[in-house]
Amino acid sequence: HKLGGDAIPADLAASFWTGLRDQGDEFFIGAERAVAGGARLWRLSVPSTTPELKLHGEQLIEWGGAQRWVVTPLEPRALREAAAAVGGHATLFRALDKSGGVFAPLSAPLAAIHRRLKASFDPHGVFNPGRLYPDL
């Protein structure tokens, strides 16, 4: 199975790349509608040689294959496990419900480091409590 693609005529290239950069192209417009209906938009960072990921939903592949956008109703664990299985990670980019966390859960040692850093830089806990990780 090969990944497909098309050459973009020069007169359309600038608007195409601007649409991707600004997340205003058809994929992201569709993603906004899907998110409004309860789906989630994920950004996966994986090795560029990673084959197609068998995930339910619409996908957009950028950066020579290293960045994958996925719009799906799948639970966070499914995306995180799929990305981790190929040496990558998944970040929840847009969703109505972010209770599953934006980033993958930290290991116990990393969580301890994060807590100490947060306590050092934000001793009163006023800077975005719970935004990156629910318990920080």
Predicted regions and their residues:
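Glycine-rich, acidic/polar active-site loops that bind/position phosphate-bearing ligands
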Residues: H1
